[in-house]
Curated annotation (Swiss-Prot):
Residues 1-33, 36-74, 77-113, 116-154, 167-203, 206-242, 246-285 form the LDL-receptor class A domain. It is linked to Defects in LDLR are the cause of familial hypercholesterolemia (FH). Residues 689-708 have a biased composition (Polar residues). PANTHER family: LOW-DENSITY LIPOPROTEIN RECEPTOR-RELATED, LOW-DENSITY LIPOPROTEIN RECEPTOR-RELATED PROTEIN 2-RELATED. The NPXY motif mediates the interaction with the clathrin adapter DAB2 and with LDLRAP1 which are involved in receptor internalization. A few residues outside the motif also play a role in the interaction. Residues 765-811 are cytoplasmic. GO terms for cellular component: cell surface; clathrin-coated pit; early endosome; Golgi apparatus; late endosome; low-density lipoprotein particle; lysosome; plasma membrane. The chain crosses the membrane at residues 744-764. Residues 692-722 are annotated as: Clustered O-linked oligosaccharides. It comes from Sus scrofa (Pig). The gene is LDLR. Binds low density lipoprotein /LDL, the major cholesterol-carrying lipoprotein of plasma, and transports it into cells by endocytosis. In order to be internalized, the receptor-ligand complexes must first cluster into clathrin-coated pits. Forms a ternary complex with PGRMC1 and TMEM97 receptors which increases LDLR-mediated LDL internalization. N- and O-glycosylated. Ubiquitinated by MYLIP leading to degradation. This is Low-density lipoprotein receptor. It is found in: Cell membrane; Membrane, Clathrin-coated pit; Golgi apparatus; Early endosome.
């Protein structure tokens, strides 16, 4: 668009409420009234006449400034198989009279009869019903734990599974509700157990006379009260403080002799300061701005004594005289997605698939409806962001904890802590138990975190008891332990298959957030400070930022993917009493809270606008957002090569894209096997020198659990063999059994003769070198005639790393 003064601006900037043309022609009434919306858009009308997608019309959220997009909308109607709450929301009929308030107004539990359970069910003391098989199995399923009460389970005592009375380590406290927490969190004034048992029977803290007692009972040094910094967790040390500092503000003047007087007493021909500094003869009545604006580049403001330089909005003073443009885009939260810096201002733009909302200036998704999927212990539920649809997706589960989806294939994956398995099914077939596929069914202890690589069709999971991070293909046929560290407690995990990285939280000692390649290499700690109990973690791919919740600090924080620009989004001991997981979409952050038994949302940039999404849940843990824009397309280099599976005999894993020269993928072998010299084939760990374990192997600080590959392994020559056959081939690489013992009598004499010949040759060569004069240099660099070079060689389908070579200093 060409402004009337000749300047050109982007056409999408006209009539957006901000003036880009200096003459204002981009926001003039004539310009805006001439705008016509394209087919599929809705015109807000009015003076601005902005266009929004038709799908935003009557969606319950005002997008036009004049609210025209929500005018004349008919009331939302629920389908025949849904229950309509009094507030107009729709929920699944199974949620009605289930003893849980699923309508925010509670209308689904009004006038409900006393529930009765079927013959194959057990009725909890709270009147809810659970399958009879879940009662007295050593795992509490009723909200009040009554299914495991001794009076109900005497007849089942012999059939109970063996369980440790205290599964926690010596450095942990065992909550009565079953969790393990750090022993240092016991009686610290902050509830960490679900049942608050960590704060029971605690001695009341008494502070010394020189200390201040916070409202939560903790003590801080008395000098920290009213020091303008929050030292108490409940911020009570800064309440009721009078932080008035003398001579601050535009109406105060500080004399050079120390007094503070009112500004109206300056230059009034009366001495108010002892040193007469309020009545300087040369400066009173002088306007320095009349002479070349006092040297100011933009605005000169005359004062009673002296003058000051000011800058227009969007500029900052750099040397008391000169103004410089402020780059607002240095703030990662200036815009929700793309920030364009302009002279004196900035513009926000959106990624493909999003459109800037006229009213809030936030990027809003276009197209399909976004859903929240979340676990509720015995089921997975599905809910739209406006709660207009709220249903049960996967019912009758034992103890579902972790969750993730693959949007393109319309599949959902989840882990069950009680079953110690990872499952998957098609979302449209989720209610059918017969459609569940067991992806990982063995060698799991506590699969707390789960993430799907939607580009390379792999799943990654954490195990907090084994202290491992593992990978498998989405069918569960091939798997490998990528990382294991003693004392670690990995929890949640998120992947970035576009760039080849994964991130996970670890609440072991010390707590941290780790980053590594999706092939297990280059693992390091990204966050190690101001972190205590990191739980859920999620990734904003478009913005390149990580978000996580800390259950001990009651906070939501963010950081860029390289560990910089850390920000605290929200701290709230009430709404973040015990946050477990979180999800990001558009400008919103959604999180589950175990103690509140609820799901909340807030603005992910400011932490404001907190809303209750769902309540009265039963241990809500993981939460994911289902929308096609959350999983952008990428290149699967393992399938782009001429060789099947990238030429890898077992797993082909994406490599981290650290720089433009980084490999696209590397091969990996199952636990207990190593890569051969070709960096594609797999050999047993007993293979002698001649094989090499290069950087494409995993980074593990301890040996992971060994898994038997139940799948067939495909070689580069497309030869298929079983795991047992693969071991036989590796064994034959170590030694071949001779056909007859008599061959030894022929081979050994020949070998001895060859050794005798080479020995004689080396003795002669040594004598010859000693008889020749040599030149010695003090600088040791001259003693090395052959340079050590390490090259990363690129083949047709990937990258390989050469084996190490010894360089002689004499040769």
């Amino acid at each position: 668009f060409q402004c009337q003064d000749g300047k050109c601006i982007s056409y999408k900037w006209i009539c957006d409420g901000n003036t880009e043309c200096k003459d204002g022609s981009d926001e003039s009434l004539e310009t805006c009234m001439s705008v016509t919306c394209k087919i599929g858009d809705f015109s807000c009308g009015g003076r601005v006449n902005r266009c929004i997608p038709e799908s935003w019309r009557c969606d319950g959220q005002q997008d036009c400034e004049n609210g025209s997009d929500e005018e004349g909308c008919s009331p939302k109607t629920c389908s025949q198989d849904e229950f309509r709450c009094q507030d107009g929301k729709c929920i699944a009929p199974k949620f009605v009279c289930d003893s849980d308030r699923d309508c925010l107004d509670g209308s689904d539990e009004a006038s409900c009869p006393t529930p009765t359970c079927g013959p194959a069910s057990f009725q909890c003391n709270s009147s809810t019903c659970i399958p009879e098989l879940w009662a007295c199995d050593g795992d509490p399923d009723c909200e009040d734990g009554s299914d495991e009460w001794p009076q109900h389970c005497r007849s089942h005592s012999s059939s109970l599974p063996e369980r440790s009375n205290n599964p926690c380590s010596a450095l942990e406290f065992h909550c009565h509700s079953g969790e393990c927490i750090h022993s240092s969190w016991r009686c610290d004034g902050d509830t960490d157990c679900k049942d608050k048992s960590d704060e029971e029977n605690c001695d009341v803290a008494t502070c010394r006379p020189d200390e201040f007692q916070c409202s939560d009972g903790t003590c801080i040094h008395g000098s920290r009260q009213c020091d303008r910094e929050y030292d108490c967790k409940d911020m009570s040390d800064e309440q009721g403080c009078v932080n008035a500092t003398l001579c601050e503000g535009p109406n105060k003047f500080k004399c050079q002799s120390g007094e503070c007087i009112s500004l109206d007493k300056v230059c009034n021909s009366v001495r108010d300061c002892r040193d007469w500094s309020d009545e300087p003869l040369k400066e009173c009545g002088t306007n320095e701005c009349l002479d070349n604006k006092g040297g100011c580049s933009h605005i000169c403001n005359d004062l009673k004594i002296g003058y000051e330089c000011l800058c227009p909005e969007g500029f900052q003073l750099v040397d008391k005289h000169r103004c410089e443009d402020i780059d607002e885009c240095q703030d990662p939260d200036a815009c929700s997605q793309i920030c364009v810096n302009l002279e004196g201002s900035y513009k926000c733009q959106c990624e493909e698939g999003f459109q800037l909302e006229p009213l809030t200036k936030a990027c809003k998704a276009i197209g399909t409806i976004a859903y929240l999927f979340f676990t509720n212990r015995h089921e997975v539920r599905k809910m739209t962001l406006d709660r207009s649809e709220y249903t049960s997706l996967i019912p009758n589960l034992k103890n579902v904890v972790a969750l993730d989806t693959e949007v393109a294939s319309n599949r959902i994956y989840w882990s069950d802590l009680s079953q110690r398995k990872i499952y998957s099914t098609q979302i449209d077939r989720a209610p059918s138990f017969s459609s569940y596929d067991t992806i990982i069914g063995e060698d799991l202890q506590a699969p707390d975190g789960l993430a799907v690589d939607w580009i390379h069709s792999n799943i990654y999971w954490t195990d907090s008891i084994l202290g491992t991070v593992s990978v498998a293909d989405t069918k569960g046929v091939k798997r490998k332990t990528l990382f294991q560290e003693k004392g670690s407690k990995p929890r949640a995990i998120v992947v970035d298959p576009v760039h080849g990285f994964m991130y996970w939280t670890d609440w072991g000692t010390p707590a941290k957030i780790k980053k590594g390649g999706l092939n297990g290499v280059d693992v390091y700690s990204l966050v190690t400070e101001d972190i205590q109990w990191p739980n859920g973690i999620t990734l904003d791919l478009s913005g390149g930022r990580l978000y996580w919740v800390d259950s001990k600090l009651h906070s939501i924080s963010s950081i860029d993917v390289n560990g910089g620009n850390r920000k605290t989004v929200l701290e709230d001991k009430t709404k973040l009493a015990h946050p477990f997981s979180l999800a990001i979409f558009e400008d919103k952050v959604f999180w589950t809270d175990i103690i509140n038994e609820a799901i909340f949302s807030a603005n992910r940039l400011t932490g404001s606008d907190i809303h209750l999404m769902a309540e009265n849940l039963l241990s809500p843990e993981d939460i994911v957002l289902f929308h096609n824009l959350t999983q952008p397309r990428g290149v699967n280099w393992c399938e782009r090569t001429a060789l099947q599976n990238g030429g890898c005999q077992y797993l082909c894993l994406p490599a981290p894209q650290i720089n433009p020269r980084s490999p696209k993928f590397t091969c990996a072998c199952p636990d207990g096997m190593l890569l051969a010299k070709d960096m594609r084939s797999c050999l047993t760990e007993t293979e002698p020198a001649g094989t090499t374990q290069g950087p494409s192997m995993v980074n593990s600080t301890a040996v992971g659990p060994k898994h038997t590959a139940s799948s067939e392994l495909t070689t580069a020559e497309s030869v298929t063999m079983s795991q047992h056959a693969l071991g036989d081939v590796a064994g034959r690489g170590v030694t071949e059994k001779p056909q007859s013992v008599g061959a030894l009598y022929i081979v050994l004499p020949i070998a001895l003769l060859i050794l005798l010949f080479f020995g004689t040759f080396l003795l002669w060569k040594n004598w010859r070198l000693k008889s020749i004069n040599s030149i010695n240099f003090d600088n040791p660099v001259y003693q090395k005639t052959t340079e050590d070079e390490v090259h990363i060689c690129r083949s047709q389908d990937g990258y390989t790393y050469p084996s190490r070579q010894m360089v002689s200093l004499e040769d």
